[in-house]
């Protein structure tokens, strides 16, 4: 599994975390379900993290794997297609996210309105003026109402037949616009694709909207459940909201918070509302293999404590690669050529940690239902 062509210490090395960094990393690992009791269902993972980046389907599923026990990628597909308990849509920061269906409408209302201006600009660059974009959004709604679920190709075919240009990036931003307007979400799997469906049909009518203070309080509380300890700037960056909104949400739940000497805030009670039990400090997570765009790299302003000097090997051109985590730090990268896990270590790890990563590699293959290599 380990790449024999790569030196075991390809980088300059990643200095051990300071005691303070280790404490914060361990707390966040518990919040992220990377330490402590694993989730039993995909919906529990999505509920704890609130939103999992979903532009890479395999990466989103691997984020569920590493935070749960005994699940498979097929279980995530079942939640998307049969149970309708999970959906994928453009939300925070204008990025596709996997979320619980119950959390879709609150997140949509909070994080998407400010994205329409940028979407209109990009559509204009694709030669689609506002009136044509409005018409296309209406057509998408009509086609999904009549024929949905529809794959990307099926939707493009219908739009083209109606005289709507879909070449270049036009289709991407037209479906983005329909999502921002609450018309469509990506729900069921058709083959290996996430098909588009009408949001109101797939999820039901949107519930009554709370006032903004209540909504921002909900967001702050849910964010901290999966990301504490954190700062107001961490929340603002993760949600793609102005800092003033993050502050407003945190102020609304101030009686529920503990602020440490490090300036980081935490929920005073467990995410389920029970009192925090006194006990030893949480331990750093066990060695694991994390997939592309893993939430551990997207929940806070800084990724330095996790990636250290290895960031150039893991983050390239805005793409966040798969990486190996040991002691709360990235120590290598990994890939799946031919369905086999290939691990490239960027620094030395102990034999025990290497064996743990190899064991986790087998679980990756189990989760993805990859065929075992043929024996000779």
Can you name each region flagged by the protein language model?
Residues 1-153, 157-167:
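Phosphate-backbone binding and catalysis cores of DNA-processing enzymes
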Residues 71-78, 165-177, 243-250, 316:
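Short amphipathic alpha-helical interaction segments
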Residues 81-91, 95-96, 179-189, 254-261, ...:
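A short, conserved structural fragment
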Residues 98-104, 190-209, 264-280:
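Short, cationic-aromatic polyanion-contact patches
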Residues 108-122, 201-221, 286-288, 296:
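Short, amphipathic alpha-helical interaction segments positioned at domain boundaries
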Residues 168-246:
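Loop-centered beta-sheet repeat module
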Residues 255-310:
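Non-catalytic regulatory appendages
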Residues 314-376:
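Glycine-rich, small/acidic residue-mixed loop/short-helix segments
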């Amino acid at each position: 599994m380990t790449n024999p062509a790569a030196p075991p210490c390809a980088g300059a090395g990643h200095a051990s975390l300071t005691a303070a960094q280790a404490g914060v990393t361990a707390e966040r690992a518990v919040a992220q379900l990377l330490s402590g009791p694993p989730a039993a269902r995909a919906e529990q993972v999505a509920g704890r993290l609130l939103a999992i980046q979903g532009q890479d389907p395999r990466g989103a599923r691997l984020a569920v794997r590493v935070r749960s026990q005994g699940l498979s990628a097929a279980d995530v597909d079942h939640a998307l297609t049969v149970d309708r308990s999970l959906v994928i849509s453009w939300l925070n920061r204008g990025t596709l996210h996997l979320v619980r269906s119950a959390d879709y409408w609150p997140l949509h209302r909070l994080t998407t309105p400010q994205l329409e201006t940028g979407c209109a600009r990009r559509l204009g660059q694709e030669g689609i003026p506002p009136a044509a974009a409005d018409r296309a959004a209406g057509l998408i709604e009509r086609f999904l109402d009549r024929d949905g679920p529809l794959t990307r190709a099926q939707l493009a075919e219908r739009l083209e037949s109606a005289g709507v240009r879909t070449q270049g990036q036009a289709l991407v931003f037209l479906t983005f616009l329909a999502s921002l307007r609450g018309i469509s979400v990506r729900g069921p799997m058709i083959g290996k694709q996430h098909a588009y469906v009408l949001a109101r049909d797939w999820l039901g009518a949107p519930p009554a909207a709370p006032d903004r203070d209540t909504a921002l309080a909900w967001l702050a509380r849910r964010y901290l459940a999966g990301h504490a300890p954190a700062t107001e700037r961490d929340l603002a960056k993760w949600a793609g909201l102005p800092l003033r909104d993050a502050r407003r949400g945190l102020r609304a739940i101030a009686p529920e918070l503990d602020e440490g000497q490090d300036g980081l805030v935490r929920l005073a009670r467990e995410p389920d509302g029970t009192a925090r039990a006194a006990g030893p400090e949480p331990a750093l997570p066990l060695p694991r293999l994390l997939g592309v765009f893993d939430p551990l790299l997207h929940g806070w302003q800084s990724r330095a404590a996790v990636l250290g000097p290895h960031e150039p090997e893991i983050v390239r051109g805005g793409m966040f690669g798969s990486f190996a985590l040991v002691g709360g730090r990235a120590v290598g990268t990994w890939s799946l050529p031919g369905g086999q896990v290939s691990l490239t270590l960027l620094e030395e790890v102990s034999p025990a940690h290497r064996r743990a990563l190899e064991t986790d590699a087998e679980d990756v293959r189990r989760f993805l239902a990859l065929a075992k290599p043929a024996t000779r």
